[in-house]
Curated annotation (Swiss-Prot):
<dbReference type="InterPro" id="IPR018371">
    <property type="entry name" value="Chitin-binding_1_CS"/>
</dbReference>
<keyword id="KW-1015">Disulfide bond</keyword>
<dbReference type="GO" id="GO:0006952">
    <property type="term" value="P:defense response"/>
</dbReference>
<dbReference type="InterPro" id="IPR023346">
    <property type="entry name" value="Lysozyme-like_dom_sf"/>
</dbReference>
<feature type="disulfide bond">
    <location>
        <begin position="41"/>
        <end position="55"/>
    </location>
</feature>
<keyword id="KW-0732">Signal</keyword>
<feature type="disulfide bond">
    <location>
        <begin position="36"/>
        <end position="48"/>
    </location>
</feature>
<dbReference type="GO" id="GO:0000272">
    <property type="term" value="P:polysaccharide catabolic process"/>
</dbReference>
<keyword id="KW-0378">Hydrolase</keyword>
<keyword id="KW-0326">Glycosidase</keyword>
<dbReference type="InterPro" id="IPR036861">
    <property type="entry name" value="Endochitinase-like_sf"/>
</dbReference>
<keyword id="KW-0147">Chitin-binding</keyword>
<keyword id="KW-0146">Chitin degradation</keyword>
<comment type="similarity">
    <text>Belongs to the glycosyl hydrolase 19 family. Chitinase class I subfamily.</text>
</comment>
<feature type="glycosylation site" description="N-linked (GlcNAc...) asparagine">
    <location>
        <position position="278"/>
    </location>
</feature>
<dbReference type="Pfam" id="PF00182">
    <property type="entry name" value="Glyco_hydro_19"/>
</dbReference>
<feature type="signal peptide">
    <location>
        <begin position="1"/>
        <end position="28"/>
    </location>
</feature>
């Protein structure tokens, strides 16, 4: 009898151990819904782990691997804050600015809207540009603005949606839409609200101000640039693209990435500066 009880006890232990393993496996196979604990990846098959098999192709969540981000480049070499500098007015000469705007087609809605005077006035309203600025940064800024606005053809997004996200800080105003406007195509109520707060302008109540005033349009674009893009200038032009539209990077939209690079190379050439390194993302 004692022997039989021992056998039953051992069988029960084995059963419970097996059940525990099966339960754990069931949870790990459901990580696409429940996620993984700690710094683990949820694989394409629903398992949690930390190796390439989990964090590589098909990874659903967690610190999934992508192509490695560019290693920060020292500001003294390939960064956008390196190289020749000058005041905004001396860098944005009439000839340089006109060489960009002269390519805007006659049928473009923003033909004649973006002016050199507006760009300089907007830049000088930011402390970062009151002294001298790297020519590479100006080339990069204008390259990104040019790409986002269709080579300065547009001041408003073609597909004009509502773009209202619930917010107690920057609530959407009745009848107002927060679609892309200006050279960076600033979008969503929370961006209009934050930009307006920084600039001292009622952009939540009057988002169309960005499309009416070229100075405000450039100010909003520069607000976004200073807040989100300027911190990565030392990493090269590719890092600015990642900050503006990271979905294009790592093979997402190679043609769009190259378009941005082409604008940048063109403007660097016109300003007489080398482009630095890490151009793509």
């Amino acid at each position: 009898m004692a022997t039989q009880n021992a056998i039953l006890k051992k069988a029960l232990i084995i059963f419970l151990f097996t059940l525990t393993i099966m339960t754990g496996t069931a949870f790990s196979q459901n990580c696409g819904t429940n996620g993984c604990k700690g710094n683990m990846c949820c694989s394409r098959w629903g398992y949690c782990g930390t190796t390439k098999a989990y964090c590589g192709t098909g990874c659903q969540s967690g610190p999934c691997n992508s192509k490695p981000k560019p290693t920060p480049t020292p500001s003294g070499s390939g960064g956008l804050n390196a190289g020749p500098r000058g005041t905004i007015a001396s860098v944005i000469t009439p000839a340089f600015f006109n060489s960009i705007m002269s390519k805007v087609g006659s049928g473009c809605p923003a033909k004649g809207f973006y002016t050199r005077q507006a760009f300089i006035a907007a830049a000088e309203s930011f402390a970062a540009y009151k002294g001298t600025v790297a020519k590479r940064e100006i080339a990069a800024m204008l390259a990104q603005f040019s790409h986002e606005s269709g080579s300065f053809c547009y001041k408003e997004e073609i597909a004009r949606g509502r773009y209202c996200s619930p917010s107690t800080t920057y609530p959407c105003q009745p009848g107002k839409n927060y679609y892309g406007r200006g050279p960076i195509q600033i979008t969503w109520n929370y961006n209009y609200g934050a930009a307006g707060k920084f600039l001292g302008l009622p952009l939540l109540k009057d988002p169309d101000m960005v499309a009416r005033s070229p100075t405000v349009a450039f100010q909003c674009a520069m607000w976004f640039w200073n807040k989100n893009v300027r911190p990565v200038l030392s990493q090269g032009f590719g890092a600015t693209t990642r900050r503006i539209n990271g979905g294009e990077c790592n093979g997402g939209r190679p043609a769009a990435v190259q378009s941005r690079v082409n604008h940048y190379l063109d403007f660097c050439k016109k300003l007489g500066v080398t482009p630095g390194t890490n151009l793509s993302c």
